[in-house]
Amino acid sequence: MGAVVVDDGPSGVKAPDGGWGWAVLFGCFIITGFSYAFPKAVSVFFKELIREFGVGYSDTAWISSILLAMLYGTGPLCSVCVNRFGCRPVMLVGGLFASMGMVIASFCTSIVQIYLTAGVITGLGLALNFQPSLIMLNRYFDKRRPLANGLSAAGSPVFLCALSPLGQILQHEYGWRGGFLILGGMLLNCCVCGALMRPLEPPKKSEATKEPAEKKAKKKLLDFSVFKDGGFVIYTLAASIMVLGLFVPPVFVVSYAKDLGYQDTKAAFLLTILGFIDIFARPICGMVAGLKWVRPRCVYLFSFAMIFNGFTDLMGSMSVDYGGLVVFCIFFGISYGMVGALQFEVLMAIVGTQKFSSAIGLVLLAEAMAVLIGPPSAGKLLDLTRRYMFVFIIAGIEVTTSALVLALGNFFCIKKKPAEPHTKEAAAEREELNKSEDKTPEDAKVDSIEVEQFLKDEPEKNGEVVTNPETCV
């Protein structure tokens, strides 16, 4: 993954913060929607799958877990593929895989076959779209990055609002097999989003400043030096604990309502409520995170969001009727939206732009292990106790614990770096150096925060969107 994975573009390109970036944001919005909403939306088919194959709650919960585990666990593989082939080809192939998995799943005759098709193949396809789209988004936006991350993250609740009732309708009209087939066709839209991912290139420079071919060949595919950063280690640990319980309530809330005796359509409407609230929570939280006095303390806002989410799970465990579940979904949608809007923004703030692609792949890999444990364990607990209260309590404790690990770890273990003075003399001197120097030192090592500040202050033109035959299809 090296310094910058995306399309192997030269470092030091100033983010356009607009232009074609809005098209990239739209593509990322759709990809995020499919990637995160799909594992939850397929839960509306669980009752039918239980009746069809004679399995338990824990068995069907594995479908969502495998989807999420593939989305997270293949992070390093996705980074290497992007580094080798570019974002656009990887996303096009990923869209085909995602569609093919659901189409084949519609012909399956056992739950294990569904694990391999709807779980592994579709999950791999979504992963090959999700990570490249995030990397491209964070290269196109800098000053507006919190807002861009919030808007793209809103794709998850928007698609959840649409896919959950749509899945219920498809199941009623065509059965779960017909529903899987139609959803597989919809996933081909990932290929369209992949076509929007055009690489950035900096303004043309003289031959003396061009990076030698030998140096390009030596770039690392995966940079493990991020583990030397204490902030990254704390974030990875906290995120891994968080995902143990974060995805459990959305997976089981529909079944919870059905077991209370409510109709399938009414039960599925709970996910629509959750998603509708989530739609507004994510961009609003992104705007708040972009405020001058909030952005330097974004990690603590993220910790608050996780505590809020965990507390909501604990309160939701006391729900005994449909009204209680509606209230739970409203507050869960707010807290879940805050977590979704901030998780990658905080990671970027911790490791910096240059190491983001390495960091996100390794974080997703660590989270994959937790995802494989969370929902299946909750399903097994439900099979043993037949009480959803315990499932929600365990999920709430896990998410709250992760918030405490992140907040306390950063407060006590991470030393704050003194703010760099921005005097007029220093700014004038830096501008003079930028104008006079013809060559950038090859092995300059700087802090990630300094890199981002330099890119913001540098009076260089924004990078232009180009079509590079080596990185585009």
UniProtKB/Swiss-Prot annotation:
Cytoplasmic side: 1-17, 83-91, 137-149, 201-231, 290-297, 343-358, 410-473
Region (Basolateral sorting signal): 427-449, 449-473
GO MF terms held by the record: lactate:proton symporter activity; pyruvate transmembrane transporter activity
Region (Disordered): 421-447
Catalytic reaction annotation: (S)-lactate(in) + H(+)(in) = (S)-lactate(out) + H(+)(out); pyruvate(out) + H(+)(out) = pyruvate(in) + H(+)(in)
Keyword Transport: yes
Its biological purpose: Proton-dependent transporter of monocarboxylates such as L-lactate and pyruvate. Plays a predominant role in the L-lactate efflux from highly glycolytic cells.
Name this protein carries in UniProt: Monocarboxylate transporter 4
Gene symbol of the encoding locus: SLC16A3
